[in-house]
Amino acid sequence: MKRSYPDDLVIGNLSRRGFLKGVGATGVLLVAANWGWRDALAAEKKAFGADAMPHGWVDNPKIYVSIDRDGTVGIVCNRSEMGQGVRTSLAMVVADELEADWSRVKVIQAPGDEARYGNQDTDGSRSMRHWFEPMRRCGAAARQMLEQAAANQWKVPLGECRAEQNKVLHAPSGRSLSFGELAEAAAGLEVPARDKLLLKKPEQFRYIGKDVARAIDGADIVNGRAGFGFDARFDDMLYAVVARPPVYGGKLKRYDAAAALKVPGVVKVIEIEGRPIPSEFQPLGGVAVVAQNTWAAIKGREALVVEWDAGVNGGYDSVAYRKQLEEAARKPGKVVRDSGDAAALFARGGDIVEAEYYLPHLAQAPMEPPVSTAWYKDGACEVWAPTQAPQVTRERIAERLKLPFDKVTVNVTLLGGGFGRKSKPDFVLEAAILAKAFPGRHLRVQWTREDDLHFSYFHTVSVERLQAVLGADELPQAWLHRSVAPSITALFGPDSKHQGAFELGMGLTNLPFAIPNVRLENPEAPAHTRVGWFRSVSNIPHAFAIQSFVGELAAKAGQDPKDYLLKLLGPARRIDTAELGDSWNYGESPERYPLDVGRLRGVIEEAARQSGWGGELPRGRARGIAAHYSFVTYVAVVIEVEVKDDGALLVHKATIAADCGPQINPERIRSQLEGACVMGLGLAALGEISFKDGKVQQDNFHQYELARMPLAPKAVSVHLLKPDGDLPLGGVGEPGVPPIAPALCNAIFAATGKRIRELPIRNQLQGWRKA
């Protein structure tokens, strides 16, 4: 069987015993971190971080380090790479503690197997904060084993041996041995006990924290050798596209495949059974056209005659639904936080300010649409997919095909963007289901851009209504916020009409303002389409509404927006988020990860200073500021804009300040924040998915527009605050998105006097001078 695919992205479905045996036969060093995590944590009342994740640590994280005889250092990455640099950053950590020569490092992608690799969900901006320490320990353990092997061979004290750049040196004699020469002997040694590990001090780091551009896959991506989902190619390939019900919950009534089967290259037409609401991560169902090439499959689908039953969501209309959300926002809802007595102050009246904000559904729209290749034979299934959740994918395939778990192999390719869409494996299941109909042949299911936009797990639509009772100092004495949005939890329960704790904890319940009376409510909002994870999730609507409202209050008070925001935050202090009603805190310990107002103030001050806040600007330009805490990271943004007479929006500069704790790979951190800025601008200015008769109205990028060069900032500067003291790692992939929209809209107000309360902005600036 001929295969065109990078070997380092494929691992065979070996048992642990088989893998170890194979490694021993080739004489390489293999290290598995194994220190009985459950025993160590047994006394804790509640687990946090990776320990709280499904299979987060199990009994052995099984993060492997291997060294070949030629000195090549193999590092297994258990997280999915989608441009955030995790394959590079995790490898950097191991290589640093190991003292590996970076030019000799090879990264091997782990297949979906949580029992071996621990939790593999690549979401929540938590890969580095959950795996930094385990990877350090693995690197350190391997280093000490190599040093011990050298000491044994030279018959010298261990303390005289020191690993450095793929060698172990014996300073007194000047002798050295390469890692490759020591690998076989080191492999026979016991892994050092956890309390015997000698981790490097920060000043000894060679790669960690160094501001050097490294990208383990960079050259391959540039020259086309990198393996994305589309690059899994075999000589016996079949290709399929699927006609899916255009309305969520719809069903197939009838179809006629006669014309489709006449299309040259079409092999077969197969019905896929969908799952009734709630669909969870299952395929929507429909009719698949299988062909000898993608084009034939697409033309065959066009020739299908299909009749659908729209079902309960056939009347879903974005315009009408917005009105429902607005009506709900004007009535009391489920109370999710009630500090002081806000109700009494609002009943008393006085200087009350209110505003309402709207955000539509959004689609992740990764540049690489969903795609998956599957192979089925003799009761076993193997897939190649750009998935963010390989273990969930494996579980769902086993369930759907009624296979033993160990008969399913999920190979993780590079992802051409993910943004949360590829954490749902419906597209991989489609390939597995269809491959079973063609035993022994590889079958790829390809989604078109239209498929991607029509059948995504969309970011929620939202109405946010805020009110404040102002005191004599123009600061809020009482605060009321009603957040109305369908929840991701509706994927799992049909009657779910309130946001989950994890959604509420994304900028709503953990509001850090020093306001004595706060009431937060979450009215009902039923879901009429698939709502799913999206880069930064519910932080987007919460940050947009709250930071825009702060801008409005500052303008009413006639005060500088930055100074007003700092007054609202109050003095530097550390808040236990549970005291605010946030029971989630991004899954982290409130003791280790308190909401630190001082750090939030710090990024605001830094962004303002670096942007030249308060300084003069050319005529027609203005600045806006916003700040937000998400994924245990603090980000502030200043946007400098110009609005032309015809309403054209120019973003001259974006200044970003972030405090994410220790910085493992500063270059990748900056690149993610830069990318978040461009994405956030595109969402704010252009992003909207709308529905009519239950169907998505946008087909491609001419209707669902992304940020293009004219909208991108002429300059983006990212400033990373150095951690003060022993701070834990924060997230990076998502925190840069939420403050972008409010900073942009606050800047637009400063430039034009026009307040933007609904997104996208699109044509709202046309005729602003006349207004």
Q: Model features per residue range: what roles?
A:
Residues 114-117, 126-131, 182-231, 333-372, ...:
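Glycine-rich loop/linker segments at domain edges
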Residues 14-35, 564:
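N-terminal export leaders
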Residues 87-92, 395, 418-438, 445:
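Thiamine diphosphate
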Residues 43-89, 93, 120, 217-220, ...:
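Conserved beta-alpha junction segments in alpha/beta enzyme cores
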Residues 2-3, 132-212, 264-350, 414, ...:
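Molybdopterin (Moco) oxidoreductase catalytic core of the xanthine/aldehyde oxidoreductase family
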Residues 238-246:
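Short glycine-/aliphatic-rich beta-strand segments at the starts of folded cytosolic domains
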Residues 95-122, 144-176, 261-263, 400-409, ...:
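C-terminal catalytic domains of large/alpha subunits in multi-subunit enzymes
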Residues 1-14:
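N-terminal secretory signal peptides
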